[in-house]
Swiss-Prot record:
NCBIfam families attached to this UniProt entry: FeS_CyaY
Name recorded for this polypeptide: Iron-sulfur cluster assembly protein CyaY
InterPro entries documented for this protein: CyaY, Frataxin/CyaY, Frataxin/CyaY_sf, Frataxin_CS
Recorded name of the encoding gene: cyaY
Keyword terms, alphabetized: Iron, Metal-binding
Iron listed as a keyword: yes
Gene Ontology terms, MF aspect: ferric iron binding; ferrous iron binding
One cellular component term from this protein's GO annotations in UniProt: cytosol
SUPFAM superfamilies assigned: Frataxin/Nqo15-like
Protein function: Involved in iron-sulfur (Fe-S) cluster assembly. May act as a regulator of Fe-S biogenesis.
GO terms, biological process: iron-sulfur cluster assembly
One Pfam family hit: Frataxin_Cyay
Length: 108
């Protein structure tokens, strides 16, 4: 994958996360979302955070959550955990639901 392709796909991930948080905040959630360049910080009502950031040199997207740090690479049309193969949006859904205490579903 070229650098241009990576950036387009990775930026689409950040945009999808932003859209999901906007929709969730219209409902029962109160998630503070801050974007600083290629880093998104989601802060939940209980003060816990999830950070999603791009790693262009490695062509990866990373998640830092209470559950740990996770690296995702674009494989066969999806962002997959480099260790477990878990799909990015499925994993983010699990981490955010655990930290928010309310269900929230992320998708592309």
């Amino acid at each position: 994958m070229s650098d241009t392709e990576y950036l387009a796909r990775a930026e689409a991930v950040l945009a999808a996360v932003e859209r999901t948080v906007d929709v969730a905040n219209d409902g029962d959630h109160d998630i503070d979302l801050e974007r600083n360049g290629s880093v998104l910080t989601l802060t939940f009502e209980n003060g816990s955070k999830i950070i999603v950031n791009l790693q262009p040199p490695m062509k990866e997207v990373w998640i830092a959550a209470k559950a740990g740090g996770f690296h995702y690479r674009f494989i066969d049309g999806e962002w997959r955990d480099t260790r477990t193969g878990t799909e990015f949006f499925s994993a983010l859904t699990d981490y955010a639901t655990q930290q928010a205490g309310l269900p929230i579903t992320f998708s592309a």
